[in-house]
Curated annotation (Swiss-Prot):
This is 2,3-bisphosphoglycerate-dependent phosphoglycerate mutase. The lineage of its organism: Bacteria, Bacillati, Actinomycetota, Actinomycetes, Micrococcales. Belongs to the phosphoglycerate mutase family. BPG-dependent PGAM subfamily. It comes from Clavibacter michiganensis subsp. michiganensis (strain NCPPB 382). Its EC number is 5.4.2.11. InterPro entries: His_Pase_superF_clade-1 (IPR013078), His_PPase_superfam (IPR029033), Phosphogly_mut1 (IPR005952). GO terms for molecular function: phosphoglycerate mutase activity.
Length: 251
């Protein structure tokens, strides 16, 4: 039997807008002090477990890039090769980007709020190109043209993420490398949905906490040996996932 392939998923640390309870999406916001500490702890968990990444795949958003750099430095792996892609970006929240989650919940009600936030195939209203939180003039997306999202649902995230999973991440796993993917709540939910075969309905209940490595051992067909993977700090992961689920209720 072939050796299991090791995939480590890491959601970026807490960001300034996570702390302010704002919809972030593709807006490029910095880590908070808490997020920096989470990145450091993630690196310590990797080092303590002996799960040392050989290659990093991350989004082009600074909160994921910085989390990965902080974690890898703490784990003594700053030198590994890196690939960055917009396909691992957070879900684009459209016209909700920059809006307060609690205010949005109060304004539109729990049903509409839940639909925009957790529906598999219903995106929020699209963002205008001249909105201050639009990416229409961001140079990192200049080559996307009409493919630049103006809003997304989770289904859209899966459709733009899976080609990269197949073309770039799977080959690294097949070569025997331990792969670290540092990304975002929804791009990681999209990948976990694919790995674990989670239904369109059940994925709404999955929450991924910030800053805690989630380790998957995959067989030769890229199926999880342990469904759901294993967090390197299960207790902190459970508390973090509960905090993510409660977003919107905070003032």
């Amino acid at each position: 039997m072939a050796e299991p392939r090791t995939l480590v998923l890491l959601r970026h640390g807490n960001s300034d807008w996570n702390q302010k309870n704002l919809f972030t999406g593709w807006v490029d916001v910095e880590l908070s002090e808490q997020g920096v500490a989470e990145g450091q702890r993630a690196g310590e968990l990797l080092a303590e477990s002996g799960i040392l990444p050989d290659v990093l795949h991350t989004s082009v958003l600074i909160r994921a890039i910085d989390t990965a750099n902080i974690a890898l430095k703490r784990a003594g792996r700053s030198w590994i090769p890196v690939q960055r892609t917009w396909r691992l970006n957070e879900r684009h929240y459209g016209a909700l980007q920059g809006k307060d989650k609690a205010q949005t919940l109060a304004e539109y009600g729990p049903e509409q709020f839940a639909t925009w936030r957790r529906s598999f195939d219903v995106p929020p209203p699209p963002i205008d190109d001249d909105d201050e939180y639009s990416q229409s003039r961001d140079p990192r997306y200049a080559d996307l043209g009409d493919a630049l999202p103006r809003t997304e649902c989770l289904k859209d995230v899966i459709e733009r993420m899976l080609p990269y999973w197949e073309s770039d991440i799977q080959p690294d796993l097949a070569s025997g490398r331990t792969v670290l993917v540092t990304a975002h709540g929804n791009s990681l939910r999209a990948l976990v949905k694919h790995l674990d075969g989670i239904s369109d309905a059940d994925i709404a209940e999955l929450n991924i906490p910030t800053g805690i490595p989630l380790v998957y051992r995959l067989d030769e067909d890229y199926r999880p040996i342990v469904p759901g993977g294993e967090y390197l700090d299960p207790e902190a992961a459970a508390a973090g996932a509960a905090a993510v689920a409660a977003q919107g209720s905070k003032k």
